[in-house]
Amino acid sequence: MGKGTDKLYITHSEWSSSDAYGASTGANAGARAQRRGASFKKLPFNFCAASLQPFKNPVCTPDGTIFDVEVIGSWLEKHKTNPVTGEPLSAKDLIKLNFARNGDTTDSDENKGDLIDPVTFKVFTDNTHIVAIRHGSYANVFAWETVERMNIKPKMWRDLVDDEEFGRRDIITLQDPQNVSASRDLSQFKYLQDGQDAILTKEQEEERKGGTVNIEALGRVGEKVLRAKEAVERARAARQAGGADVNRLTQALTTTSTNSATNNNKTAIARGQSLIQERKRPANAATYTTGLTAASFTSTGLTPSTSGSLALLSDEQYLLKPSHRIKNKGYVRMETNLGPLTLELLPEFAPKAVWNFLRLSEKGYYRDVAFHRSIRNFMIQGGDPSGTGRGGSSIWGKNFEDEFEGPNTHSARGIVSMANKGKNTNSSQFFITYRPASHLDRKHTIFAKVIEGQDTTLTAMENVATDGSDRPLNKIVIKDMIILIDPFAEWMKEKKQKEGEEERKREVARQGGTEDDRTTWTGKRIRADGTMEGQGMGEGGGGGPKVGKYLDVGAVKKAATTTTTTTRKAEEEEVDTWEEPVRKKAKMGGFGNFDGW
């Protein structure tokens, strides 16, 4: 409440009120409340969560986030994550949505008509509770009240459209007006929080490329519009390529003047770019800080810190990040008492399993460990030091999660996978298949395959007789694991070489640019003081006569003189010398070949 009377003091009721004059609220309470309300914005149900435009061919994730199939497809080709939540996402996780429309869909316009419930024919709005009933890779869309009244309450668990059976867990909520989840709240979208723009649809990309401005009708202004559009496209391309400062980059590339002031300007630009690159975020930086700033402000025993620098991940944490794709193949030779097996490691889609196997092999964990289980025409299992099948521990001392993402399947002989006793219970045990076993797909993590020794060693293992509990009667023992190529070490080596090459290029730019930056269009090089080579120098200097910009006549003559000095001295004593007659210079018209400029 405001002031009721014209008093020279604030009453008790005014102090305790919750409006703009309350002591606990402040004079700008209304503005703050308005900002809080403006921060929330709901995505319409018929809009793609990635492009923020109406969808044409809708698909959804298992949690109910709707995308257009073309837009999310282009996103997954680059990022492999859900743009809304940031969690890993692949194309096979998407579910096609079948919406019903009340218009004639046989026309060329596929989106003609409103989206409706296929049973009650009610039009969907932003206030309709919408669900989808999943059947494998597709789902039919209904209103919740229809499913509740005709399926759940009568316990008739068959789809009302195609009569397919479903369960309660197959019901996916697409929109609930009473519970607006993060999948519909624009302020919670991760790619928008990260500062990225909405993904363009194909129509928007074509419109942006072609343009919609009538340049001819604008006259001179049209040329300015074209130049502005080209500048925006260059800036966008440079930002996508590496985030460089477009103005500085353009200035550094187009500066070709030979005076000293221009060279000083280029040097300052190179220094500015080097400062920006020095502040570049490290590759192994975490998403959280070291915490020294908060700790130094709360503890007198620490030195005050105000930088808020990011924490650095260890090599193991950095290499095993889900966003990494280490495509280098690794190789390990398994020495057994029946012969060697050469394994090819696959760290691209199972980095943790490969890391665990390599580190255990490196410290000799598998040395003298026997294979405790062998089933003919199926597989052989080992990796348990106790030999019981119930032991074993990972390199981290605890079980680690499964890694099923990727195209690897148990479709051949010699596939090496992690043995487990349930979901996310991988330790040190592994098995090698004797035959294809497709029923093990997405149940056991595949991390390697046998590339040498299948016909000899693996066949000998399979032929060993077993007892009633599938334990080999004659022991099959791993003598040693020899690491031939460590894919993580190779990847780090390539990364360091790449960083060294980038540092060398930055050093060249810091010293004045590349060779092309210090050469004029006539082919003459510019010195550090701003003068050109060959300028102000006679025959005795370093800039003798040249043929074009490639052949230095003076250098050729000097080399020929040096190599034949002894011969000439001997010949001069015996052969008379004669003077070559002076040739008349032919008159030339015009500018000639510009070699005197």
Swiss-Prot record:
Keywords: Isomerase, Nucleus, Rotamase, Transferase, Ubl conjugation pathway. Residues 495-521, 560-597 are annotated as: Disordered. Its main location: nucleus. One of its GO terms (cellular component) is catalytic step 2 spliceosome. The lineage of its organism: Eukaryota, Fungi, Dikarya, Ascomycota, Pezizomycotina. Pathway: Protein modification; protein ubiquitination. GO terms for molecular function: peptidyl-prolyl cis-trans isomerase activity; ubiquitin protein ligase activity. Residues 41-114 form the U-box domain. It is found in: Nucleus. This is Peptidyl-prolyl cis-trans isomerase-like 2. The gene is ppi-2.
